């Protein structure tokens, strides 16, 4: 299986990489969070752009991206606008969603973008090609905050992401029972053993799904999300606690 290397970080080998999300609502809070996060230990910084209030102005978004990059020049930066339909904070048109992602790619400030699978195949493929032409990696994602699809359906979605050119397919689902958590882990293992030729990220959310955020190295998830301050999704745990558990499992 091939790995993804971003700023000397190798995703897809060894311990799952820890991603934390920055969720400032304006330039000042973005800067304050970025400076505060320098004290934490993690591998990838995700900027959740949907929390930023001035998304109507592409220039304001890029100014904030520059602030983050200046604060942490050596950390891989993932640009993510999470749509409202997949659990995000704001609703925007598909066209503006694509415009923001292309502007981020053009800026040279971000290393990766998050691109939602169900944006539309043609737009997704065009954006993937555009990102790759500018040496930007694509995390292609799907989130279900209401349920856990069947293992077969989750594998199909991850395989479709792979077929559309995702560098890292990602799926996050909400369990309604402990069996749902096992379904997510089953899908992850199935993908890893039979279909994946690149790193994959999976998680089951909320308290019941926490085990999936810890056991990625066992079942085949290459990264996991932790919280420095505020969690960006249900079930995230503090980065220091997360790293301790990941190290225990890695060294066992």
Curated annotation (Swiss-Prot):
Regulation: Inhibited by (2R)-2-methyl-3-dehydroquinic acid.
Positions annotated as active site in the UniProt record: 143 (proton donor/acceptor), 170 (schiff-base intermediate with substrate)
Pathway recorded for this protein: Metabolic intermediate biosynthesis; chorismate biosynthesis; chorismate from D-erythrose 4-phosphate and phosphoenolpyruvate: step 3/7
Domain of life: Bacteria
Enzyme class at the top of the EC tree: lyase
Protein residues bound to 3-dehydroquinate: 21, 46-48, 82, 213, 232, 236
MF terms (GO), sorted A to Z: 3-dehydroquinate dehydratase activity
Example GO biological process: aromatic amino acid family biosynthetic process
Keywords noted in UniProt: Amino-acid biosynthesis, Aromatic amino acid biosynthesis, Lyase, Schiff base
InterPro entries, per database record: 3-dehydroquinate_DH_AS, Aldolase_TIM, DHquinase_I, Type-I_3-dehydroquinase
Reactions it catalyzes: 3-dehydroquinate = 3-dehydroshikimate + H2O
EC number of the protein: 4.2.1.10
Task performed by this protein: Involved in the third step of the chorismate pathway, which leads to the biosynthesis of aromatic amino acids. Catalyzes the cis-dehydration of 3-dehydroquinate (DHQ) and introduces the first double bond of the aromatic ring to yield 3-dehydroshikimate. The reaction involves the formation of an imine intermediate between the keto group of 3-dehydroquinate and the epsilon-amino group of Lys-170 at the active site.
Record text on subunit structure and interactions: Dimer of dimers.
Similarity section: Belongs to the type-I 3-dehydroquinase family.
Protein name as annotated: 3-dehydroquinate dehydratase
Originating gene: aroD
